[in-house]
Amino acid sequence: MNQTYGRLVSRAAIAATAMALALLLIKIFAWWYTGSVSILAALVDSLVDIAASLTNLLVVRYSLQPADDEHTFGHGKAESLAALAQSMFISGSALFLFLTSIQNLIKPTPMNDPGVGIGVTVIALICTIILVTFQRWVVRKTQSQAVRADMLHYQSDVMMNGAILIALGLSWYGWHRADALFALGIGIYILYSALRMGYEAVQSLLDRALPDAERQEIIDIVTSWPGVSGAHDLRTRQSGPTRFIQIHLEMEDNLPLVQAHLVAEQVEQAILRRFPGSDVIIHQDPCSVVPREIKKFELV
């Protein structure tokens, strides 16, 4: 599982970096030729794309390293750090766009040959849609937070390129402030995406529990297993591709230790079949030692 995860995540990071570099060169030419502030917005975004994707590429490779003596739980948290760094990069580009857009709203300037800008934007739109489709497939397979953050960023690029097409079309017909207005709207959307991405990264760094649906699946597996009378103290978190799951099983007092161990092993394997690659810790408690107030299962 880890080999497949590493291969897919690395390919997604390389694809994003390569596409960002190619589009940057095209957008530099288009901005120089047309003077469009919307294309400048796209150019700045491509610079951020490159910085973010390179950060992803380096951090993902680090996060895939196996656990060592100093990092006994592995290096998966590096993915959350990459997502947090991306959110800061993107916020900076959004603020730059605000300033540039306001300046052009106050003093609009006609652009040269919007047709060139439209052609470049169509190319960027098609390439970005292809990349986002590939990234979405990788996220479904790996649940990588770094790739998900990159995908959210490029999804905003799809909307941005669509808005730029409209702005260039309006400018072509003499609505010169449309270029700056759309660039301002793009900046607002980019900032929103950055804040959302940063929030998710911080939650992961703070060891937020797995989604309710996944925790409920764990509860269902455990409480329906023969030999398990109940369960409590479920604790979960995720670091990179690895889910960490801890739970206490309640068993009959007179159950032999060997049999209790066998039941716990079976439950662990059942959880691993549902969530491959997880780190599962199970503690067995005799029913008589479980306080009455925690008999009823609660998510922790």
UniProtKB/Swiss-Prot annotation:
Location of the protein in the cell: Cell inner membrane
Subunit structure: Homodimer.
Known role: Divalent metal cation transporter which exports Zn(2+), Cd(2+) and possibly Fe(2+). May be involved in zinc and iron detoxification by efflux.
Entries under NCBIfam families matching the protein: CDF, PRK09509.1
InterPro entries: Cation_efflux, Cation_efflux_CTD, Cation_efflux_CTD_sf, Cation_efflux_FieF, Cation_efflux_TMD_sf, CDF_Transporter
Keywords on record: Cell inner membrane, Cell membrane, Ion transport, Iron, Iron transport, Membrane, Metal-binding, Transmembrane, Transmembrane helix, Transport, Zinc, Zinc transport
UniProt-recorded Gene Ontology molecular function terms: cadmium ion transmembrane transporter activity; ferrous iron transmembrane transporter activity; metal ion binding; zinc efflux antiporter activity
Positions with a binding annotation for Zn(2+): 45, 49, 153, 157
Gene name, Swiss-Prot/TrEMBL: fieF
Name used for this protein in its record: Cation-efflux pump FieF
Catalyzed reactions per annotation: Zn(2+)(in) + H(+)(out) = Zn(2+)(out) + H(+)(in); Cd(2+)(in) + H(+)(out) = Cd(2+)(out) + H(+)(in); Fe(2+)(in) + H(+)(out) = Fe(2+)(out) + H(+)(in)
GO cellular component terms listed in the entry, alphabetical order: plasma membrane
Disulfide bonds: none
Domain of life of the native organism: Bacteria
Family the entry assigns: Belongs to the cation diffusion facilitator (CDF) transporter (TC 2.A.4) family. FieF subfamily.
Topological relation to the membrane, as annotated: Multi-pass membrane protein
Keyword match Nucleotide-binding: no
BP terms from Gene Ontology: intracellular zinc ion homeostasis
Membrane-crossing segments per the record: 12-32, 39-59, 82-102, 114-134, 156-176, 178-198
